[in-house]
Amino acid sequence: NPVVRITNGAIRGQN
């Protein structure tokens, strides 16, 4: 689930 990882990082704070 690469999309989930990218979305999670962006929502978290652009990790």
Swiss-Prot record:
Main location: cytoplasm
Record's GO cellular component terms: cytoplasm
Leading EC class: hydrolase
Highest taxon in the source lineage: Eukaryota
Keywords assigned by UniProt, alphabetized: Cytoplasm, Hydrolase, Serine esterase
Molecular function GO terms recorded: carboxylesterase activity
Transmembrane region(s): none
E.C. code: 3.1.1.1
Catalytic activity: a carboxylic ester + H2O = an alcohol + a carboxylate + H(+)
Compartments where located: Cytoplasm
Keyword Lipid biosynthesis: no
Keyword Chloroplast tagged: no
Family listed: Belongs to the type-B carboxylesterase/lipase family.
Name of this protein: Esterase 56 kDa subunit
Lineage: Eukaryota, Metazoa, Ecdysozoa, Arthropoda, Hexapoda
